[in-house]
UniProtKB/Swiss-Prot annotation:
Signal peptide: none
Classification via NCBIfam families: L21
Functional description taken from the UniProt entry: This protein binds to 23S rRNA in the presence of protein L20.
Recorded GO CC terms: cytoplasm; ribonucleoprotein complex; ribosome
Cross-referenced HAMAP family: Ribosomal_bL21
GO terms under biological process: translation
A family per Pfam: Ribosomal_L21p
Record organism: Shewanella denitrificans (strain OS217 / ATCC BAA-1090 / DSM 15013)
Protein name: Large ribosomal subunit protein bL21
SUPFAM superfamilies: L21p-like
Superkingdom field: Bacteria
InterPro entries: bL21-like (IPR028909), bL21-like_sf (IPR036164), Ribosomal_bL21 (IPR001787), Ribosomal_bL21_CS (IPR018258)
Length: 103
């Protein structure tokens, strides 16, 4: 059984037991989170596709932890002017473990 749900403007395909990194959620570590924007639920033989959401669909997850991703380097450069600017960015994320998928 797997599901596709939406969180943080992105869509994630998950199954029970999977660990997923999502955009940062303001939830404490160890707390339970429910995602109700479920777009698709597949259970072996049957596939429930929402229009746009599956009625009564829910993905339940437990927050494993928070962290920051790898550094992305941004370089702005102007040719022939001896001008360059180097910046970096590390995006915050929340790691969750999927505990249940309810249709």
């Amino acid at each position: 059984m797997y599901a596709v749900f939406q969180s943080g403007g992105k869509q994630h395909r998950v199954a029970e037991g999977h660990t997923v990194r999502l955009e940062k959620l303001e939830v404490a570590t160890g707390a339970t989170v429910e995602f109700d924007q479920v777009l698709l639920i597949a259970d072996g033989e049957t596939v429930h596709v929402g229009a746009p959401l599956v009625a009564g669909g829910k993905v339940v997850a437990e927050v494993v932890g928070h962290g920051r991703g790898e550094k992305v380097t941004i370089i702005k450069f102007r040719r022939r002017k001896h001008h360059d600017k180097k910046m970096g960015h590390r995006q915050w994320f929340t790691e969750v473990k999927i505990t249940a998928i309810n249709a």
